[in-house]
UniProtKB/Swiss-Prot annotation:
The keyword Nucleotide-binding applies. This is Elongation factor 4. SUPFAM superfamilies: EF-G C-terminal domain-like (SSF54980), P-loop containing nucleoside triphosphate hydrolases (SSF52540). Pfam families: EFG_C, GTP_EFTU, GTP_EFTU_D2, LepA_C. GTP binds at D14, H15, G16, K17, S18, T19, N130, K131, I132, D133. The keyword Phosphoprotein does not apply. It is found in: Cell inner membrane. Required for accurate and efficient protein synthesis under certain stress conditions. May act as a fidelity factor of the translation reaction, by catalyzing a one-codon backward translocation of tRNAs on improperly translocated ribosomes. Back-translocation proceeds from a post-translocation (POST) complex to a pre-translocation (PRE) complex, thus giving elongation factor G a second chance to translocate the tRNAs correctly. Binds to ribosomes in a GTP-dependent manner. It comes from Nitratiruptor sp. (strain SB155-2). It catalyses: GTP + H2O = GDP + phosphate + H(+). Its main location: membrane. InterPro entries: EF-4, EFG_III/V, EFG_V-like, EFTu-like_2, G_TR_CS, LepA_C_sf, LepA_CTD, LepA_IV. GO terms for molecular function: GTP binding; GTPase activity; ribosome binding; translation elongation factor activity. GO terms for cellular component: plasma membrane.
Length: 596
């Protein structure tokens, strides 16, 4: 056991942790050079394209130092805020972490969030300054930056360039010297933490575990404590991005893949504890929580016959991503579809893209919403995920909306813009600290609803891409909210309803109908587009009718003749308007997402 080191890599997006992982793997010779590819740990196409890590991956490396052979278990973590639960489980499985910071950029909000998780788990942190080969690199400034924001001593920070491979050997030596070996009682009952799980079409649902006490053997009956079900261990493997090695036992302090022939990934949820069925451990590992979706959106197939295909695709994705929740719903405008819950906006984009890419579906997504709590006048409290479920105004006593605590780091020159954006989004300042003279860290409370739409894009725009942002949920607060409906030709279009703060309703309504006017195709009769709160219309635009020139065939002659033809046309238009239906184009639904 004293020769094992378990460590994770913590970094903000784009600070180079997947490349660093590549170099460590190459240096330890775990993959032959000819099979090596960039970002070998990111296995999904979409991860490579966007340059982000979505699923945590692991690899077991061997490294010789001073004549001893060491086993290094590298646990790669996702860097994005939506996947922070996966990060916290990966860190709980390690004894140490490499804090990777870009030498040209300095500390970012995401890094800080993950460092706090690491400190809560008492991990040994090794600061690593990456990308020192860049002309803009300034390692000394970055070290000062880390000391100011995190209070971590950087005198023996390690400077590396993952791209050129400079400093990698020093880093491996530091991992062995500074990260403690795992502790735990090898004779105690089995106790292992599932820190990742995924679905393999041949082997079923697989659990990636870290064994804390005892060991897991092939053929053992094990109990998964969160579900209370027992399974037989069919196979055990050590993780590797290309060819995992089989083994007969995973011992205390090691990481490995457990194959139990499961059909459903819900049986091995991330954060759950595996123990021996006959001699279970008394307490599960703490900190297990079911992944809770925060953002909801409707997903509808453009071709309505594809509803069953979408159901099947969602079921398959859920095997791989336990954080998705979904239930069928219908909309008068869009037909049959599903209300799907996601961890956040990036998660939503990734899921939609995977559905379209891996299952060949054409989908339309409605505006994302959050879960509101509504206290009704009869004292009952209900939760709603879809604006169209909101009860009529006379039945509502109060509406509560979810808030988040956001941490934003921005260069000082853009501070004014950022503060304006935050007050526009109804944010409340908690604190403001200057990290260095030219960078500020802000803490704000913001309604989740304001973040869901386009907050991140806007923050990047007003700071020219330099600000970074991270958030965590902070509970519910009372809000002065109303439901804004859009009526086309007198009928409410359910898929376009949104919940907005009362003081913004007028403005949003006006903007929306203006936008809709450009998108609704002209009909043979005039179409009124209205925004309403309950029965009160607050804004209106009219799409004028297309008309035929009915008087073209009259040459000269009496005006009454022309008038008769025009009156007749008018009557016809009136009749059409009474029975006419308007087909809305796809763009109309997407326009709701884009109003400010």
């Amino acid at each position: 056991m004293e020769n094992i080191r378990n460590f994770s890599i913590i970094a903000h997006i784009d600070h180079g942790k997947s490349t660093l992982a590549d170099r460590l793997i190459q240096e330890c010779g775990a993959i032959e050079d000819r099979k090596m590819s960039d970002q070998v740990m990111d296995t999904m196409d979409i991860e490579k394209e966007r340059g982000i890590t979505i699923k945590a991956q692991s690899v077991r490396l061997t490294y010789k130092k001073d004549g001893k052979e060491y086993i290094l278990n590298l646990i790669d973590t996702p860097g994005h805020v939506d996947f922070s639960y996966e990060v916290s489980r990966s860190l709980a499985s390690s004894e140490g972490a490499l804090l990777v910071v870009d030498a040209s950029q300095g500390v970012e909000a995401q890094t800080i969030a993950n460092v706090y998780i690491a400190l809560e788990n008492d991990l040994e942190l090794i600061p690593v300054i990456n990308k020192i080969d860049l002309p803009a690199a300034d390692p000394e400034r970055v070290k000062a930056d880390i000391e100011n924001t995190i209070g971590l001593d950087c005198t023996d920070a390690i400077e590396v360039s993952a791209k050129t491979g400079q400093g990698i050997n020093e880093l491996l030596d530091a991992i062995i010297e500074r990260i403690p070996a795992p502790s735990g009682d090898p004779t105690a009952p089995t106790k292992a933490l599932i820190y990742d799980s995924w679905f393999d079409s041949y082997l079923g649902a697989l659990a990636l575990v870290r064994v804390f006490e005892g060991e897991i053997k092939k053929g053992q009956e094990v109990l998964v404590m969160g579900t209370g079900k027992t399974h037989e261990v069919i196979d055990l493997m050590y993780p590797h991005p290309i060819n995992p090695q089989k083994t007969s036992t995973i011992k205390t302090g090691e990481i490995g893949i457990v194959v139990m022939g499961l059909k459903n990934i819900g049986d091995v949820q991330v954060g759950d504890t595996i123990t021996d069925a006959k001699n279970p451990t008394p307490e599960p590992i703490e900190g297990f929580e079911e992944a809770k979706p925060f953002v909801f959106a409707g997903l509808y197939p453009i071709d309505t016959d594809k509803f069953e295909d979408l159901r099947e695709a969602l079921n398959k994705l859920k095997l791989n991503d336990a954080a998705i929740a979904f239930e069928p719903e219908t909309s008068a405008a869009l037909g049959f579809g599903f209300r799907v819950g996601f961890l956040g906006l990036l998660h939503m984009e990734v899921v939609k893209e995977r559905l379209e890419r891996e299952f060949g579906l054409d989908l339309i997504a409605t505006a994302p919403t959050v879960t509101y709590k509504v206290k009704k006048t009869d004292g009952e409290t209900i939760e709603i995920q879809n604006p169209s479920e909101l009860p009529p105004p006379q039945e509502i006593d109060t509406i509560y909306e979810p808030y988040v605590k956001a941490t934003i780091i921005t260069p000082t020159e853009f501070l004014g813009n950022v503060l304006n954006l935050l007050s526009e989004k109804r944010g409340v300042q908690l604190k403001m600290d200057y990290i260095t003279q030219d960078r500020v860290m802000l803490e704000y409370e913001i309604p989740m609803n304001e973040i869901v739409m386009d907050f991140y894009d806007k923050l990047k725009t007003v700071t020219k891409g330099y600000a970074s942002f991270d958030y965590e949920p902070s509970g519910y607060k009372e809000g002065d909210l109303v439901k804004l409906d859009i009526r086309v030709a007198g009928e409410v279009v359910d898929a376009l309803s949104i919940i907005v703060p009362k003081e913004k309703a007028q403005y949003k309504g006006r903007e929306l109908v203006k936008k809709m006017k450009e998108l609704v195709p002209r009909q043979l009769f005039e179409v009124a587009i209205q925004a309403s709160i309950g029965n009160k219309i607050i804004a209106r635009e009219t799409v004028s009718a297309m008309r035929k020139n009915v008087t073209a065939k009259c040459y000269g002659g009496d005006i009454t003749r022309k008038r008769k033809l025009l009156e007749k046309q008018k009557e016809g238009k009136k009749r059409m308007k009474a029975i006419g239906k308007v087909q809305l184009p796809q763009e109309a639904f997407l326009s709701v997402l884009k109003i400010d």
